[in-house]
Amino acid sequence: RDLRMSRGLGDVYKRQLNIQSYGLKKRLEHTNCKNAVIGISGGLDSTLALLVTVRAFDLCGIDRSGIHCITMPCFGTTDRTYNNAVKLTKQLGCSLREINIMKAVRQHFEDIGHNEDVHNVTYENGQARERTQILMDIANQTWGMVIGTGDLSELALGWATYNGDHMSMYGVNGSVPKTLVKHLVKWVAENDMDEASRATLLDIVNTPISPELIPADENGNIRQITEDLVGPYELHDFFLYYFLRCGFRPSKIFFLASRTFKGTYDEEIIKKWLKTFFRRFFNQQFKRSCLPDGPKVGSISISPRGDWRMPSDASSEMWLREVETLSVSYTHLRAHETCA
């Protein structure tokens, strides 16, 4: 629906954006930093990070030219995301720099003896870490700060490259779930942008979510769709909320999800992705144990300095064992069990 017609939601979105922006403003002022460096991809997360950084610079009275947007195309970059990244940077009045990383990544593959035709985790993470190295070095060049783009959903699932996009100097999206990222970007587009910028932002909202680390298909379209690989974010964000905020066990989360998403996902699909959620949430904790600073936006956070302190070698066996037993609707669960 048209978010401009929902004043209540608009107030919520504005508060959430303000928390992110004022958090970054405080860090910029504390460090006397006049420059920010962002890897801009044309995807949702880097777009929200850029919008937040623009707001923070405006609040500080710093010229937007101090926001250095770096686009780093490689094997999987599509025209759609590249063009949106370039257009949005120019529309917002930020500085743009393009660094094609293909040559550097190929040299790296040659150095370590990796076949470029083998599209495995080494192939993907090599690109992500090359990008992070560039951002960090440009931050040194400009006396700037690398702004992290990863969101809460990605961190919960470990859908980030360790010491790649996982790392920054201040992560503005770390407590914002992916489903909310999309709504925030759309709200800004509908309420706070001129016509050209609005069109760019709405196209970004409608672009399939992808890290673009695998080459595009024969038509130049995104081949690597994140939700095909790890599952729908609306399910994972649902699981995450009721697991962290309410402390519910897998059977109750399954019960609630089966009814909430009835007609959208059948129970076998929900069970499949619930298993993925618990497996990944536990075995990816090591990435969350060393997260950069960032603001807490909503009611849950997985910062090791805040809401969530968990050993990296914690076992998921008990939770996964319960997921395996799920086969019927859990009507025996007490209806009065609610969030505290």
Question: What positions do the PLM features span?
Answer:
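Long hydrophobic segments that form regular secondary structure
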Residues: 16-18, 22-23, 29-33, 138-155, ...
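Generic long, charged, amphipathic alpha-helical segments
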Residues: 203-230
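A phosphate-binding catalytic loop at a beta-strand-loop-alpha-helix junction
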Residues: 20, 28-60, 253
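Single conserved hydrophobic/aromatic residue that forms the stacking wall/gate
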Residues: 2-13, 332-340
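Secondary-structure transition/capping motifs at alpha-helix termini
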Residues: 27-34, 55-67, 77, 87-99, ...
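Active-site adenylate/phosphate-handling loop in enzymes that bind or generate adenylated species
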Residues: 57, 92, 116-194, 213
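Intrinsic disorder and flexible/low-complexity segments
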Residues: 251-333
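A conserved beta-strand->alpha-helix junction
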Residues: 62, 66-122, 128, 154, ...
